[in-house]
């Protein structure tokens, strides 16, 4: 047996070499440049052992194969040439694995992503477990990159060009059965027999060649390929709005390899990787990745968390049902739901059933796993079953006396250590805790809708909240699969506070005569997933505008919205998607009809609907108000750091990830440019655009929010 720091070679008695991958001191395996020499030493031993029948690569980690290449390697590259060299080194190593003279099998359990899948693709066959943790994909596009170690060339030849383009352009991850159907793996087996199944496959002298499906064979021909690439380019441009250069390069590189051969394809891949690594988009996306990783490690406070064995939820509505699902099905914690009637409890239970049943239908989980997770959720119309709950989340109506009553009832019916967490989106946590016997155990935990999809939560301590309460709540959020940021107990907290002026300005432009679709298209072009008017429809016009008076009372006229317009829309029973009537027309099932704006909206608010502003002007007016408010939040310590502010905006409202978040974007523009732009807009549109003191100070001192890759605290 020969041991290296990350790889261990063991030649079995049946002459099959097993290479175990185990990066020391790390929970997950990642590929690093320094491992190349270690792998080559093992490959040399394999080539020299003429008695070997086959090779199996397998992870020694409990639940991952290889999660990807170490992204820090890219950050160390000073220029495109160095990044290109890094890619070529990876390509060469994979080529050496593929060139081994005996069958080489990748035995995959857990995450097999990025460079990990590229290594598996270099093997002659792949076999994986049927475990829910097993996923395969090439997510490099999400970092503004493309697979740089041969993935763009091997994957299309293995699964077909159409499937490969879909996987690489989206970064989607396939589960075991999906990977088998696509031809990405050759077999799916229980984890208990993974190694032996891989060994048996390695012993086969001749491995049968897989035939691509008819559709993929047609698309592989010159005519089919030309049509496919033309269509993919068009659809990709529509989706990315030209904001993600990696997608264009991915298409070019794959097409080059298929049209001109693998050698040209590998060369194009390496060059594109090097160039993309230096783009501001990739740098911003990688910064978001590292920031989110840091946030997930942040305990929230220095105190150790308290016990967290079970959770209670008050309210079985849309939010309560979603919170129950992430707590039980993501966090694995028993959940007890209390509602004033059984209808609410049944709604919450059905919410989880529907989500889990969808997973069963898609073969992501088994029916037995669905039943196991559902068994964690129970309900009642009183506080039976609440006495031992460690934390209770309130998800009732936005009514202060009602929430204060909930605090009193929880303190009366639950344990002395039970934490009360309010899912309020607008009410001050200090006011909710005003009459509490144990105010140190009251905290805000603001989820975003739909709970099962939105990754962010805001954790909001008030002045008396204890450090342990913060730590316990942050721990729960992480168990729920969320990315938590701790924010101050000020009106609107962080996300809603920066979102409100952005939406207000969109409504204001609507009253000036700008068309709904023009406003939305301008912000989508800027990089948001949906425009502000459509977002208001999705959230619910009644819900989305409810916070405006709260913010206006706290911060003054800059948060005022055209009240008559909002009132006219609400009085016409327009709530958005949820009741089928908003700014857009909706079908019976709540689906938009080609995003068709309801023309009656213009008459309702008394305008003609004729756009005069350019898309750039529309986007500038909305975005600059958001940025200015984000800078105020930094100054007032509403957020703890620029890092948290960027994560909150990207994960909470879809701020364009390729810009890195509002604070990285402001740093890229420069505080001087920010102040000048805001002053110009203030002269045109009024004092709501006046640059905040934080930006003026930073412009004078030539400071930035981020310093040397670290977070800057508010001053």
From Swiss-Prot:
Cited Gene3D superfamilies: 1.10.1040.50, 2-enoyl-CoA Hydratase, Chain A, domain 1, NAD(P)-binding Rossmann-like Domain
BP-aspect Gene Ontology terms: fatty acid beta-oxidation
SUPFAM superfamilies: 6-phosphogluconate dehydrogenase C-terminal domain-like, ClpP/crotonase, NAD(P)-binding Rossmann-fold domains
Entry GO CC: cytoplasm
Reaction(s) this enzyme catalyzes, per UniProt: a (3S)-3-hydroxyacyl-CoA = a (2E)-enoyl-CoA + H2O; a 4-saturated-(3S)-3-hydroxyacyl-CoA = a (3E)-enoyl-CoA + H2O; a (3S)-3-hydroxyacyl-CoA + NAD(+) = a 3-oxoacyl-CoA + NADH + H(+); (3S)-3-hydroxybutanoyl-CoA = (3R)-3-hydroxybutanoyl-CoA
Superkingdom of source: Bacteria
Pathway: Lipid metabolism; fatty acid beta-oxidation
GO molecular function: 3-hydroxybutyryl-CoA epimerase activity; enoyl-CoA hydratase activity; long-chain-3-hydroxyacyl-CoA dehydrogenase activity; NAD+ binding
Region of interest (Enoyl-CoA hydratase), ranges: 1-190
Lipid metabolism found in the keyword field: yes
Main location: cytoplasm
EC number: 4.2.1.17, 5.1.2.3, 1.1.1.35
Site positions per UniProt: Important for catalytic activity: 118, 140
HAMAP family recorded: FadJ
Protein function: Catalyzes the formation of a hydroxyacyl-CoA by addition of water on enoyl-CoA. Also exhibits 3-hydroxyacyl-CoA epimerase and 3-hydroxyacyl-CoA dehydrogenase activities.
Name of the protein: Fatty acid oxidation complex subunit alpha
Lineage, top ranks: Bacteria, Pseudomonadati, Pseudomonadota, Gammaproteobacteria, Enterobacterales
Gene designation: fadJ
């Amino acid at each position: 047996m020969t041991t290296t720091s990350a790889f261990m070679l063991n030649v079995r008695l049946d002459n099959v070499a097993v290479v175990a991958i185990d990066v020391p001191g790390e929970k997950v395996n990642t590929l690093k440049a320094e491992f190349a020499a270690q792998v080559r030493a093992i490959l040399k031993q394999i080539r020299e052992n003429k008695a070997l029948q086959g090779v199996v690569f397998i992870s020694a980690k409990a639940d991952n194969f290889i999660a990807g290449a170490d992204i820090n390697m890219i950050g160390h590259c000073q220029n495109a040439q160095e990044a290109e060299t890094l890619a070529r080194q990876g390509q060469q190593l994979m080529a050496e694995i593929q060139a081994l003279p005996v069958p080489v099998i990748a035995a995959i359990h857990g995450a097999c992503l990025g460079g990990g899948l590229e290594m598996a693709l270099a093997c002659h066959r792949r076999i994986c477990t049927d475990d829910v943790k097993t996923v395969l994909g090439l997510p490099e596009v999400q970092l503004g990159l493309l697979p740089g170690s041969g993935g763009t060339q091997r994957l299309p030849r293995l699964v077909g060009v159409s499937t490969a383009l879909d996987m690489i352009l989206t970064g989607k991850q396939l589960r075991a059965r999906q990977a088998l159907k696509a031809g990405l793996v050759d077999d799916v087996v229980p984890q208990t027999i993974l190694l032996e199944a891989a060994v048996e496959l390695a012993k086969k002298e001749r491995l049968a060649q897989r035939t691509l499906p008819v559709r993929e064979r047609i698309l592989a021909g010159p005519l089919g390929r030309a049509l496919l690439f033309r269509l993919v380019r068009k659809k990709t441009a529509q989706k990315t709005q030209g904001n993600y250069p990696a997608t264009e390069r991915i298409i070019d590189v794959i097409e080059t390899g298929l049209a001109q051969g693998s050698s040209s394809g590998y060369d194009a891949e390496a060059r594109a990787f090097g160039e993309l690594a230096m783009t501001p988009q990739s740098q911003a996306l990688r910064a978001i990745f590292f920031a989110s990783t840091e946030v997930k490690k942040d305990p929230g406070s220095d105190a150790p968390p308290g016990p967290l064995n079970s959770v209670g939820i008050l309210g079985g509505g849309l939010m309560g049902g979603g919170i129950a699902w992430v707590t039980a099905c993501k966090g694995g914690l028993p959940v007890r739901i209390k509602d004033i009637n059984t209808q609410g409890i049944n709604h919450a239970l059905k919410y989880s059933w529907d989500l889990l049943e969808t997973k069963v239908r898609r073969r992501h989980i088994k029916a037995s796993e669905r039943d196991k997770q559902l068994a964690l959720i129970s309900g009642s119309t009183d506080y039976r079953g609440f006495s031992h709950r460690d934390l209770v989340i309130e998800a009732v109506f936005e009514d202060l006396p009602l929430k204060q009553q909930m605090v009193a009832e929880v303190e009366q019916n639950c344990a002395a250590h039970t934490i009360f967490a309010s899912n309020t989106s607008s009410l001050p946590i200090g006011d909710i805790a005003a009459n509490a016997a144990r105010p140190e155990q009251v905290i805000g935990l603001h989820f975003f809708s739909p709970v099962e999809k939105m990754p962010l939560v805001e954790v909001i301590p008030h002045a008396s909240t204890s450090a342990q309460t913060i730590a316990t709540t942050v721990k729960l959020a992480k168990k729920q699969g969320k990315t938590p940021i701790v924010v101050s107990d000020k009106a609107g907290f962080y996300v809603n506070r920066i979102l409100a002026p952005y939406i207000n300005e969109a409504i204001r432009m609507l009253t000036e005569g700008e068309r709904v679709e023009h406003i939305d298209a301008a912000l989508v072009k800027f990089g948001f997933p949906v425009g502000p008017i459509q977002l208001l429809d999705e959230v619910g016009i009644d819900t989305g505008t409810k916070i405006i008076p709260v913010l206006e009372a706290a911060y003054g006229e800059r948060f005022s919205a055209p009240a008559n317009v909002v009132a006219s829309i609400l009085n016409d029973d327009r709530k958005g998607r949820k009741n089928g009537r908003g700014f857009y027309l909706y079908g019976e099932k709540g689906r938009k009809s080609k995003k068709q704006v309801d023309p009656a909206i213009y008459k309702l608010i008394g305008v003609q609907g004729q756009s005069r502003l350019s898309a750039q002007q529309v986007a500038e007016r909305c975005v600059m108000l958001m940025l200015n408010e984000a800078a105020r939040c930094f100054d007032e310590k509403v957020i703890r750091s620029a890092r948290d502010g960027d994560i909150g905006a990207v994960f909470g409202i879809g701020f364009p990830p390729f810009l890195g978040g509002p604070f990285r974007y402001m740093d890229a523009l420069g505080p001087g440019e920010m102040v000048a732009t805001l002053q110009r807009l203030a002269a045109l549109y009024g004092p709501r655009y006046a640059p905040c003191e934080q930006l003026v100070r930073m412009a004078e001192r030539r400071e930035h929010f981020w310093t040397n890759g670290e977070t800057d605290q508010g001053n």
